[in-house]
């Protein structure tokens, strides 16, 4: 089992040790980097909730890893920021990628307009593991939602974990990378 249960709740651990508790809280010593990233992905997708309510309001969701974990809610940039923060805390390079995704406030087919747009409506990660960059979108793999003030729990998906570029490009377009690896 890659995820430890040591009696410490994630917000207290992360607050106490400034985002370095993943070594003790989430990961075991004997895992590979790929397994560590998978464990982080699965933890984020099972613990966090996509904040549908904040999209409909002017309320800005949290964007700092500690605030995101405390609130247990975020939109895509928060999910990507948290994943990057956790990966970097265990010395795994991770970029936050901004782009355009179909099905996020738009129709679900690429058109000349959406292909040409420089508008950003989504964020995800690229993580460097085993000598290659892999795509990870925890937002789209998380089925937990907060809508109308209610927390609705869903199942964790792996469809967008280590997704191949051809599949990912069906509904995502990269527009900008974070500068820090």
Where are these regions (language model features)?
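Secondary-structure boundary elements
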Residues: 6-74, 84
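Generic serine detector
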Residues: 5, 46, 54-57, 71, ...
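Hydrophobic/aromatic-rich core segments of domains that either
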Residues: 78-168
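A structural boundary/capping signal
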Residues: 18, 22-35, 59-65, 82-89, ...
